[in-house]
Amino acid sequence: MKMAGSAEKAPVKRRGKPDPKTYWQRRRNSIYLFAARQICARERRNPTAVIDIGSNATPTLEWHRKSGARLVSLDLRRPYVAEGVESLTCDFLEYNPATSYDLVTCFQVLEHVPDPAAFARKLLAIGKTVVVSVPYKWKKGRCKYHLHDPVDERKMKKWFGRDPDYSYIAKELNNVARLIQVYRQ
């Protein structure tokens, strides 16, 4: 595992993959992210430790900055890098935290990983509250980087091994939907 260094001045373009900065810019005012932020705030009002898994350089950890919590970003290639954020570049399935987290977030990641069940169960193992999102019922082939579309509640239950404590479907004005689920210990 390597620690990310200083913040990058320009986004790194990866062959065939969307630029994380552009990805965030296009989505930062979405209904989905508004809902995800409100759900995180409702779930953990005073967290002491928050980790975002699969950050892809997006600043969702900033939602928790005023809480004074320890902030950790973990991504296989591009963790979020900012002052006061512990940025980890590693494979989540190989990550073994010394302690559990009050809040674990994982937004738009499970549909990309080869073994979503192992990934989902590890999310549950490292945190007291897990907030996760996936594209909701997107047709197979809509996004060439998604390995598991369509994803719905049934598939999520299979991956997590249980029902969530609650779910919310965030539907954009263009009918693109995302499923946000909360799992508590």
Name the predicted role of every residue range.
Residues M1-L103, A117-A120, A125, K144-Q185:
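Conserved N-terminal segment of class I S-adenosyl-L-methionine
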Residues L93, L110-V113, K137:
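Short acidic, S/G/P-rich loop/turn micro-motifs used as interaction or catalytic elements
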Residues L103-V109:
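A short beta-strand submotif of the Rossmann-like class I SAM-dependent methyltransferase core
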Residues F107, P116, S133:
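Conserved residues at the C-terminal ends of beta-strands
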Residues V113-P114, G127:
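Helix-to-beta-strand junctions that scaffold the AdoMet/dcAdoMet cofactor pocket
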Residues G127-K139:
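Conserved beta-strand signature within the Rossmann-like core of class I S-adenosyl-L-methionine
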